Swiss-Prot record:
Cross-referenced InterPro entries: Tctex-1-like_sf (IPR038586)
Protein name: Topoisomerase I damage affected protein 2
Subcellular location: Cytoplasm; Cell projection
One GO CC term on file: cytoplasm
Organism: Zygosaccharomyces rouxii (strain ATCC 2623 / CBS 732 / NBRC 1130 / NCYC 568 / NRRL Y-229)
Keywords: Cell projection, Cytoplasm
Keyword Nucleotide-binding: no
Major localization class: cytoplasm
Organism lineage string: Eukaryota, Fungi, Dikarya, Ascomycota, Saccharomycotina
Family designation: Belongs to the TDA2 family.
SS bond partners: none
Length: 119
């Protein structure tokens, strides 16, 4: 199952969309390998890396988790919704959604949202 992420606003992203995707995926993969892949640790690691990339922005990271309790995620038997609203300058601020794959088939999906706001 894939999350629908058509609402991205990445045209003004401080990090290119492909690099942001890789940052999220590699951070999660590294945490999984070290046995420390908690949502809290993922948030902390992502924010540290984003802050070191550019001091011209403030970053907000949101992680929505979907657990089905089964090894496969069946899009007909689960629902997740997450809404984020903001008042910002659309020329400088934006957001990006990334669907972390369930590589180990544990029935857990994470949707990571990165928001940047110009200082």
């Amino acid at each position: 199952m894939n999350f629908e992420t058509g609402q991205d606003k990445t045209s003004n992203a401080p990090i290119p969309k492909d690099k942001l995707s890789e940052l999220i995926k590699s951070t999660y993969d590294n945490l999984e390998r070290s046995g420390n892949a908690s949502v809290d640790q993922l948030l902390k690691s992502l924010l540290e890396q984003l802050n070191s990339h550019s001091s011209l922005y403030k970053y907000i990271v949101s992680i929505s988790t979907l657990e089905t309790g089964s090894e496969t995620i069946d899009s007909e038997n689960c629902t997740m919704s997450n809404a984020i609203g903001a008042s910002w300058n659309s020329r400088k601020d934006g957001l990006f959604n990334y669907d972390l794959p369930d590589n180990e088939h544990r029935g857990v999906k994470h949707l990571v949202t990165v928001i940047w706001v110009a200082k």
